[in-house]
Amino acid sequence: MAFKKKLYQFRPKDQPQKIERHVTKDRKRTVSVNSISLERDVRQMLAEKISGTHVGLWLLIGEHLRLRTWDLLTSWTGSGHNNTIEPRLALQMVHESALCVTGVRERRTLRQKGFETLNGLPFVATDVAIHQLLDHHTIAEAEALQVALGQIRSARGHYQGQYVLIDPHRIMTWSKRQMPPKKASSSSPIRKNMQTFFAIDGESGQPLSFGIGSSSVRVSQATLSLIDRLAYILPHKALILADSEHFTVEIFNRLLNNRQFTILMPTPRRKKILQQAQSLTFTPKWAGYAVAEDSYQLTGQENSYRLIVQRTGETKDNYNYKSFATTSNKDKADLMTLIFPQRWDIEEFFKDESALGWNRASTFNLNIRYGRLSMALIAQAVIYQLRKKLSENINRWTAESMAQKFFKGIDGDLRVKNDKIIVTLYNAPSVEILKEHYENLPRKLEAEGVDPRVPWLYDFKVDFRFK
């Protein structure tokens, strides 16, 4: 029978992987895992029951199933079946973003509170394991993930507006790489920044996609790449509201005859444009406000663009001119007074949601940053769906408040009953509203046409009790 020895080594698709995990707050250990050991250890943890303060995160499971998060993550990781570890590590990143955790993982205490089990893991992976996963996936794969997520969100009605807000958002970075320091604003100190470009739906305030600038990627390149992804995500026409730094030949030439997108942006305060604005004949709209229109041609270009100008002030001595360039044919006064001011709503998005992962960057490795920020997009999407089911005084909380008071601030326990994981939450806020949406969750999901089995929890269903 010697010929039968070590046949397990030839078992297909189940080779063990080395993963670094947290053992305690200060100790780490590299362990060998495969799909069988993962399932065995997770089932053992559930059989022993779990108590902790992270059970509020389990309310996101229903939203994950509705948003098809698992399909997105398995596609991004290239996993062929549901028992692999890579999409579970990606799910850990999504839930870390939801908790707004920052700093080095050695300083965190996420273990044994229901967090790792939620990810379908018997442990919390370390920075090394997470960075190895992210570094193996390219920028193109992260962009494809953004498009797939955006298409799902569009189908679910998350994007309703006629306007898309595009804004450069600078993230502080503590990377040791040599890079030119910049100012995030005229009043801020000079420091290393990572420049990102976000596209936000103008009506719902929800993010569509993002790009990252680097030394080799100019503003025009990053913006046009972002607009290309928007064309796959949005099924309808939209007006893009941009900043003056997007005033480039490449962007205008691309959008001049675009059938889906038009653009509106303030022009830079150049002497040539100011002289042209001052020479126009203005039409008064109300006291101290007048508008005018002309065409403008960039130097060396054959194409001309619509130049609209607003003039404020009552007398010639205190006139102030502000000009905009656009490819839209909407009324000029409406564009400048009603539509463009909506662009500043994007600042509200960064103020409320940046703690999910858009406020600091520890590395400038682009594979890692694109992957990490894309996981934060998924976290923001499922939290948005959860917010719509909460009371008004809670759904207006910032991402950080949601993490502290809701996801980490509710005591509870987990136990298994037949094919269900029963999650009990004690002293949850707005309990009657939560009962309405989450008690008997499997039945509610089936009524919506959603499979209630959770693939990363080995097809267990999840139900909730509130006490």
Where are these regions (language model features)?
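Dynamic "connector" segments at or just before major functional cores
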Residues: 2-188, 198-216, 223-228, 232, ...
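Short glycine-rich loop/turn motifs
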Residues: 192-198, 321
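Domain-level cores of phosphate- or acyl-group-handling catalytic modules
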Residues: 217-272
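Conserved nucleotidyltransferase catalytic core and NTase-mimicking acidic/glycine-rich helix/loop elements
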Residues: 382-415
